[in-house]
A protein has these predicted regions:
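Active-site-adjacent structural elements in enzyme catalytic cores
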Residues: 2-266
């Protein structure tokens, strides 16, 4: 094979059912970028600014959206994000029910202080200094995020592993050549992803999780409702996705008022 024909191949492994040590080695070393399976498909996972820069380059994506922070435990979530007791109760309910949930929240100052001092803040928050804090996103990636935080206090930042604006259809082959070539490691688990929505096909399955905004237009945390009707601003479901029916039912148990505005990002 001539040198011009040689192509660097990203290492691909099948999920081993536990913490994928190859992923830990790459991410702990810094500047790494991997592709990992979740309940709804595949994500790009990084831990620092260098990794985030690689992600934006691989996805060819605009930088105005709040970053996604993967929380491997409720303790990590509570340490990082500002929440009212009602919001915390919502997370706890979904944690206990093993339901994927992401909410737009402000950072605690003490949480922000733990970010790497490398300028990553500008790439994983929006201009309001909010991020989407996600729990119960699927065992293959949960295990990595939990271990990163508990062993090294490293963050797990995420973005869907597909060309921006396109879905990966829950298949590792759907992540696209650009992302595949850019990643240091691809963890394949098409069987796991398919098992989460066994009654769906490629055309009817959800390719994303539900996202709920818990902040006002300036990024300030919404007020508690305390069973009062009509408190504004209120939670807004801004993206439908996996288990939307269960999540809205749970929200109705905690909040007397919330809005459903799919696509109402900014």
């Amino acid at each position: 094979m001539t040198e011009t024909m040689t192509k660097t191949m990203t290492k691909q492994v099948h999920w081993n059912g536990n913490v994928q040590e190859e992923a830990m080695t790459i991410l702990q070393a810094g500047k790494g970028m991997i592709v990992s399976p979740t309940k709804v498909g595949y994500i790009i996972m990084t831990t620092d600014k260098a990794g985030l820069e690689r992600k934006f380059s691989a996805k060819n994506r605009k930088r105005n959206k709040p970053g996604v922070v993967l929380c491997g435990s409720m303790a990590e979530l509570e340490e990082l994000a500002e929440m009212t007791p009602e919001i915390r109760d919502l997370y706890q309910k979904h944690w206990d029910q093993d339901i994927l949930l992401g909410c737009i929240l402000p950072w605690k100052k003490t949480g922000m202080a733990q970010l790497p001092d490398d300028g990553c803040q500008e790439l994983m928050m929006d201009q309001r200094q909010t991020s989407c804090f996600v729990i119960k996103f699927g065992r293959p990636s949960e295990q990595i995020a939990k271990e990163l935080w508990e062993k090294n206090h490293q963050f797990a930042f995420a973005s869907s592993a597909n060309p921006s604006g396109q879905g990966n259809r829950g298949l590792v082959t759907g992540i696209g050549e650009r992302i595949e070539e850019a990643a240091d490691l691809v963890i394949e688990a098409d069987d796991y992803v398919a098992s989460i929505q066994p009654d769906k096909n490629i055309d009817t399955r959800y390719e994303q999780g539900v996202m709920v905004s818990m902040v006002d237009q300036d990024g300030q945390l919404i007020p508690e409702q305390n069973n009062q009707v009509g408190i504004q601003p209120c939670p807004i479901v801004i993206r439908k996705g996996l288990d939307i029916d269960k999540i809205m039912a749970n929200m109705a148990l905690i909040f007397t008022s919330f809005d459903y505005r799919h696509g109402f990002y900014y």
